[in-house]
Amino acid sequence: MAWKLDGTYFENCSCEMPCPCTVTFDAGADYDRCQVLLAFNVREGEIDGVDVGGLTAPPVADTPKVMTEGNWKLGLVIDEAASDEQAEKLGAVFSGQMGGPMAALGPLIGEVVGSDRMPIEYEDDGLRHRVRVGDGIDVEVEDVVPFGVESGEPAQLTGVFHPANSTLTIAKSHRGKISAFGMDFDNTGRSGFSAPFAWSG
């Protein structure tokens, strides 16, 4: 039961930029809750011998103001392009059943509100990252290049506890429409992050 995933990640949440919850889970969100989409695009991956490269999984979460209080609501979307076997394997990894970074979040999740197969479009040009899921989700973030930085390199947050990576590039959303699993929010203009991710278990 070995698996390995490599790809790109981005998120968009309801906090102002940058999200204090990402700096540390016990900081407290800017508003009453932290409502977030986490988009993982698997460039290359294999789970128990099943190839899952090219597929996307964007979990949606609604958490209390202080994330460490737990009782998160989590919904998982699996790429409609996945076969039944691929969907089963991805669901096992992203729900934490097969260990890895998502398993570390397990104690914080109070309710898994659903898991759906939906059409997903994922775009990444290096600075802009976008995911569209059916008619309910359309999220795009752009990495932030600080004023005066001639190299064009975006700003980063390092040394954090985060399932995707301990180093995250700071981003801001241009689109933030999220409607799924009974969760409806618009995070346009709010916080975002992006990063490569490499998981194994």
Task: Label each PLM-derived region with a short phrase.
Residues 22, 51-59, 82, 116-122, ...:
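Noncatalytic linker/hinge segments flanking ATPase motor cores
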Residues 32-103:
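Aromatic- and glycine-enriched beta-alpha-beta binding-site module
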Residues 7, 30-32, 68, 112, ...:
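A generic structural signal for short, solvent-exposed coil/turn residues
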Residues 2-45:
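N-terminal ordered "arm"
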Residues 72-153:
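Charged linear interaction tracts used for macromolecular binding and regulation
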Residues 144-201:
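Extended, charged low-complexity segments
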Residues 47-54, 76, 110-116, 158-159, ...:
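Low-complexity, flexible helical/coil segments
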Residues 49, 126-127, 182:
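Intrinsic-disorder/low-complexity loop/linker signature
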